[in-house]
Amino acid sequence: MSIQDCHVFCSLRSCIFRLTSLVLLAVPALAQTPSALLPNLRINPPRSNVPPPGEWRTTALVEESEGRVYRLHGKAQVEGAAVLFAADDIEFNEDTGDLRATGNVYFHDFGKNEQLWADRVEYNTESETGKFYKVHGETSPRIDARPGILTTNNPFYFEGDWAEREGEKYIVHNGFVTNCKIPSPWWTLRGPRFDIVPGEHAVAYRSIFRVKGLPLFFTPFFYKSLEKEPRKSGFLIPNIGHSSRRGIMFGAGYFWAINRSYDVTYQVQDFTARGLAHHADLRGKPRSGTDYDAILYGVHDRGIEQGKTLQKYGGLSLSAVGKSDLGDGWFARGTVNYISSFRFRQQWSESFNDAIGSEVQSVGFMNKNWSSYTFNVVAARLQNFQSSEIQVTDPITQQVKGLEANAVTIRKLPEVQLDGRERQIWKNVPLWFSFDSAAGLLYRQEPLFSGDTLIDTFQTGRLMDRIHLAPHLMSAFHFAGVNIVPRFGLDETYYSESQAPNPDASQALQLPVYRVIGTDLVRSAHDFSMDLIFPTLARVFDNKTIFGDKLKHVIEPRATYRNIAGIGDDFMRFVRFDDTDLLSNTDELELSLTNRLYAKRGDTVREIFSWQLWQTRYFDPTFGGALVQGQRNVLLTTAELTPYAFLVGPRNYSPLVSVLRMSPVGQWSAEWRADYDPLLGRMVDSTVSVDYRWSKYFISAGHNLVHTDPILTTPANQLRFRLGFGEPNHRGWNAGIDGVYDYHQQVLQYATTQVTYNTDCCGLSVQWRRFSFGTRNENQFRVAFAVSNIGTFGTLRKQDRLF
C-alpha cells in the first residue's frame, strides 16, 4: 500500500527529540558561546527487506479500507525506508491527511536511531500539525569529547503529558528531560513547557533542575541556540565559593555576541572580605586566518589586615594572544602579558605556577621565510621580578615614599632580524655560508636597592641602538671514520651606549654596580670551532627480556674545540639585553659521551635508556678578562653548557653535567639531571622526576636541589608530588592529591586535594586548595557539578582539576 506524506509525521517526531536534547544542553549556561561542532558518526544495524524510498509497507492482524481511508487493527505497523510506526490501531485518511494512532504507539527512526512511545497520536500530514499524548522517547547523544567535559553513551530521554506542533514551533507540555538511566535518574530538568524552532532555538520555561529529586535551582527561562554556530547574548549561571582570605564569593556574568566575528564575556565576583573582581574576555575573528583573544582581569581590593597594617593587593593583569596570515608568505603572531604588580599576581593568581612565576613576557613578530632566509620584525617586553614590590623609605627623612617594583625591564621596540641558513657556495666544494644579523632599538631598566632604600636606577636611553652581524663559513670532512666539521665566523656588534662602574652605588651595596654612559662601542670578535664526531660503538643482544625481543647498546663519543677572541675585558662594557651580549673570549674543549639502549619488540624500536655526560676544559680560565672574581658570572659558553651558573672565579674546567633518562616500560618514565662540581667535590644541583601510571592509578614525583655557592643562587630543596586514582570519565569514586613541599623553608607551599564521584550521567567534584608562599597564605574550597555530554557549572575550573 502506498501512503504519501508520511514524512510530515517523521518531522514532528524528530523535532520532539531535538527539543528534549537541545533544551537539555541549555543547563550549563543561559548565554551560548561558540563551540566546536563535532560530527556524529552513527553506524546503523542492517535491516532486511527494506521498502524502497517513497513506498510504505503495512501489516496488521486486521486491515480495512474505504476508498483512500486505511484502518489497521492489532499489531499494526507502517514501515518506510528509514522509519517504523507501530500501534494497536492506526487510521489514515490519504485524502485529508488525517492520521490517528492509539494504543502503545511506537516510532523508530533508523537513520537517526531515535525512538518514541505514546498512548495516542493525532496528526494531519497536510497542515503539518498534530498532538502526541502521554509521550516519552529517547535519542542517541551528541558526545562532545572536549577536555573537561564528562561524557556518556546513555541516550537522551524525555517524558511529557502531551506534545504538539504549530507551524515551525514544537511544544512539549508538563515534562522532563534527562540522560540518566531510567527509571531512577540521577538528575532531571522538569518544566511545564518546552519550545523549539528548528534551526533557530529551544526554550525551557519555569524549569527546575533536580538531583535525586532534590531541587538544585529554578530558572524562569533557559535558552539554547540551535544554529550551527550558536551565538546568543545572555546571562551566565551565577556561582558561589569560599576562601579563607577572600571570604564568600558570589559571581555572575554576561555574554555579548556582538556579531558573527566578535564577542565579549564579562564576569564579576564579589569577595565579601576583600572586594570586587572583574574579568573581561574579548574574542575576535575578523577574517579567515586572523583571530585573537584578550583577557583583562582586575581586582579592587579593600585590603586585609596584617599585624596592625591594612595591606591592599589590588591591581590588574592583561593577557592576549593573536595571529594573522598576512598572505604571500607573511605571518604575524603575538602574545601580550602584563601585570600591574608582582604582589597582585601572588595574591590573586589561581594557578601555582603562575603565582610564583617571576617573568612576565610579551612578544610580537612578523615573519617571512623564503629559500634559505628568514626575516623577522620583533617587538618584545620582558619584566623579571627579583622580589615583591619594596616599600621604599626616604634615606634622609625616613618617611615611607611608597611601593617600588624590584624588576628588570627589557624592551625591543622593534628589532629587525635577517638570518640565512647554511648554503653551499660551490657545487663540488664542501663549503657552506650562513649569517645572523639584527638591528634594533632597545631599552633596559633596573632599580638598585639597599634594604628598603632605592640607591640608584640603571637605565639606558629609551631607544638605544644595537646592530649585530655574524657571518660564518662551515665545512665538513670525513677521515678514518671521524666526521670533522670546522667552522669559522666573525661577530660585529655596534652599541650606541655602554656601561661603566658606578663607584657610589658599588660602595653602598658592596657589589660591583654599573651605570650607563653615552659612549659608542663596537665589539669585534672572531671565532673558530671544530666538531669531532667519532664512530659510534654498538652491540646487539639477542636474548629476549622483559624490555623486548632484542636490545642494542650504542656509545656516541664527541668532542668540540672552540676559540673566541677579540672581546677581552671589554665584556663588562656591554649592556645586557639577551644572549647576544653574553659572548666572551674563550679557549675550550668540550667532551661528551652518550650511552643509549634501544629495545626492539616486533617491528617497533624505542629508546628505553640514555645517559649523556658533558664537561668542558678551559684553557683560558679568565675568559680574556671577562670574569670578575667573587661574583656571579654568566657567559654564553657556560649558559649553553648548563642552566645553573657556576663561575665565581677562574677555573680550568666546568662541572660534570649529567642527564639520565629511562622509560623501560610503557607507563613508567624517569629523568635525572645533575651537575657534579669536582672543584667542590659534591653535587651542586639535581633535578629528579618519576612518573608512573597503571590502570586508573597514577603517581608523579619530583625533587629539585640546589646546593652551591650562595653567591651564585639561593639554595633550594623542594619536593613535588602527585598521586591518585581515577580519570575524567571513570564511573564511581576518583581521588587525587597534588603538592609542593619546600624542605628549605619547611613549609607546604601548595596543595590540592580533589574527590570526584561520577555516575552514569553526572558527576560531583569537591576540591580543597592551599597556597603558602610570598605574601599569600590562603585556603580555598571549590565545588563543581558536571552533566554528561553537556558541561560543568560551579567554581572549580577545568584547568584547575586533577582529572
Go through each PLM region and give its residues.
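Compositionally biased, intrinsically disordered low-complexity segments enriched
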Residues: 6-9, 24, 34, 280, ...
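Intrinsically disordered, low-complexity segments enriched in proline/serine/threonine
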Residues: 14-16, 30, 36, 222, ...
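Charged (often Lys/Glu-rich) extended helix/loop segments that serve as interaction or gating elements
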Residues: 33-178
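N-terminal secretory signal peptides that target proteins for export/translocation
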Residues: 1-15
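Immediate N-terminus of the mature polypeptide
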Residues: 5, 32-36, 63, 247, ...
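Short linear motifs in intrinsically disordered/low-complexity regions
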Residues: 6-8, 41, 532, 790
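Outer-membrane beta-barrel proteins and related beta-barrel translocases across Gram-negative bacteria
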Residues: 113-114, 120-178, 182-188, 192, ...
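Bacterial N-terminal signal peptides
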Residues: 11, 16-28
